[in-house]
A protein has these predicted regions:
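Extracytoplasmic/peripheral linker and loop segments enriched in polar/acidic and small residues
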Residues: 365-374, 401-470
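Long beta-strand-rich cores associated with HINT superfamily self-processing modules
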Residues: 466-494
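N-terminal lobe/hinge region of extracytoplasmic solute-binding protein
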Residues: 31-81, 87, 110, 175-176
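Alpha-helical secondary-structure segments
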Residues: 29, 101-108, 136-140, 179, ...
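Gly/Pro-rich hinge or "lid" segments in bacterial periplasmic/extracellular proteins
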Residues: 145-203, 209-212, 318, 322
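Ligand-site clamp/hinge motif
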Residues: 189, 194-235, 363-365
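Surface-exposed binding/hinge segments that line
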Residues: 5, 121-164
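Append "and occasionally in soluble cytosolic enzymes with long acidic Gly/Pro-rich linkers
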Residues: 183, 266-355, 360, 419, ...
Length: 494
């Protein structure tokens, strides 16, 4: 009897071990640089939140790799210059089994358009005059003015109408339509998602410091590391036999921004001098180690609204000194206040730019701020110059949001208060143009104008660097750094 009990106990222990091993095999831990601010698609303001929202929710439309819009939850037809009809697919369901219906679409967009909701997406949707539900599967959008590319603006995740009307205190969605569902999310704890098709668990663990994240990856505490991976750390991690990496050409656009309302930065000659003084080739080679490419405009040439063969400023410190001497005939250096984040790699970049500008007679004073404070001050216009990146730009309406004179905060993202009659004309002409080829040509003219006037100094497009443990299979990212490949990611059996 004693031997029999020992045998039963041993069998139970083996079963428990295998069950635990199987559970761990089906759990993948993803190291991210910051925790999401919200999983509610109406309020996404940061890249991590937007990428996670795309796992939890589905939208009426989605974007292909070329950033052209295609149907997702619904097909659409244009019934008139001011009238679009969306028909929801029969197979569109929330994870609780309820169908996605027109009232869900209506409730989601109505709430975004409510000024009291303070959704950051309201500016891109103000052209909507009315939303009408025709039946459970059909919803009509009526516009204030013609917009031939209106569907581009409808990539926001659809929420159940019941959630919109009675939201919980935390973004724990009782029903969502995406390929993943939220299991748990509490303060200072990982976000835990479950993949709907097979129940596999994915933990998203926020580790701000890239060195700490690297150590967690090496120790096996996380399986995937993506976002704010410095190139030198990426290269070092790839030396380990238990890790491998992927580098994907990205569209993260880094730039220098300026306050154009007054002071030295309002002088286009000064901005031209700064552009000629920055040796981007050296920065890309020695700091980025080849993981970024020179940028001349907001979108890369592969984007339909981008442009080939943009020839802007060159590295020419001699010309820069001549312009500076013309602006400032005294021997006293021009002082330029520059704001950047606490990210150590961004500080290294700032230090190199500071040194390059010093050689042409500009004394750049660097102010380091945490990201929230930095964004707050820039949004208020409390800066002379700064460096930031636009992440995941997709739609051509960003030209209006960033460069139109009527798009200053809070109405848009023209933080430097750039005002150009010609830029406004080109943006408005492009928005009215129904022919894609002609619209692209208008945006190309706009990009040449922006290179002349330099409200921004474009710097580079940064690649997305991902490092994984060797047993992680079928994960990659795309041009805007999305996590959508997690739909098929697995851990291999040993």
């Amino acid at each position: 009897m004693y031997l029999y009990l020992r045998l039963i106990l041993a069998l139970l222990m083996v079963q428990c071990f295998h069950a635990h091993a199987e559970t761990e095999r089906n759990r993948i831990r993803f190291g991210i640089p910051t925790a999401p601010s919200s999983l509610d698609p109406r309020f996404s303001v940061d890249a991590v939140s937007a990428r996670l929202q795309n796992l939890v929710h589905r939208s009426l439309v989605r974007f292909e790799e070329t950033q052209m819009v295609v149907p997702d939850l619904a097909e659409w037809e244009k019934l008139g210059p001011l009238h679009y009809r969306f028909t929801i697919n029969e197979g569109a369901y929330f994870n609780n089994g309820n169908k996605v219906v027109a009232s869900d679409v209506h409730a989601t967009y109505k709430s975004i358009l409510d000024p009291e909701m303070l959704s950051p997406h309201i500016g891109g949707l103000k052209n909507i005059r009315e939303i009408i539900e025709l039946d459970d599967r059909t919803v009509d959008f009526f516009l204030n003015k013609a917009d031939h590319f209106f569907p581009d603006s409808l990539s926001i995740g659809i929420l159940p109408a019941a959630y919109v009307q009675n939201p919980p205190s935390k973004d724990i969605f009782a029903a969502s339509a995406g390929p993943f569902e939220v299991l748990s999310w509490t303060t200072n704890e990982p976000l835990v998602l479950r993949r709907r098709k097979d129940g596999h668990i994915f933990e998203f663990i926020a580790i701000k410091d890239s060195n700490a994240r690297s150590l967690r990856l090496i120790s096996g505490e996380i399986d995937i590391m993506q976002g704010d991976v410095p190139p030198h750390i990426y290269a070092s991690l790839l030396q380990r036999p238990d890790l491998y990496g992927k580098r994907i050409a990205g569209n993260t656009f880094s730039y220098l921004g300026f306050n154009l309302r007054d002071g030295i930065t309002s002088d286009p000659r000064f901005r031209q001098a700064l552009a000629h003084a920055i040796n981007r080739d050296a920065i890309l080679k020695f700091l980025f180690q080849g993981s970024a490419r020179k940028a001349w405009a907001l979108f890369p040439p592969s984007h339909w609204a981008g442009a080939e063969n943009l020839n802007g400023f060159s590295y020419n410190p001699t010309l820069s000194r001549e312009i500076i001497a013309e602006i400032n005939p005294t021997a006293t250096p021009i002082i330029l206040n520059y704001k950047t984040s606490t990210n150590k790699f961004r500080q290294r970049v700032a230090n190199v730019i500071q040194s390059q500008l010093a050689s042409v007679g500009v004394d750049m004073k660097i102010e380091i701020l945490d990201f929230g404070t930095l964004m707050g001050e820039i949004s208020r216009g409390d800066f002379q110059s700064y460096s930031l990146s636009w992440v995941g730009l997709r739609t051509s309406d960003m030209y209006r949001q960033i460069f139109h004179s009527k798009s200053v905060p809070p109405l848009g993202k023209n933080r430097g208060h750039y005002k150009s009659i010609r830029a406004d004309e080109l943006i408005e002409m492009a928005e009215k143009e129904s022919d894609l080829h002609l619209r692209r040509n208008l945006y190309k003219k706009l990009q040449f104008l922006l290179l002349e006037e330099l409200p921004y100094v474009p710097l580079w497009f940064e690649d997305h660097l991902v490092v994984m443990r060797k047993d992680i299979q079928s994960y990659t990212t795309n041009i805007d750094g999305g996590y959508s490949a997690l739909i098929d990611t697995q851990r291999s059996r040993k």
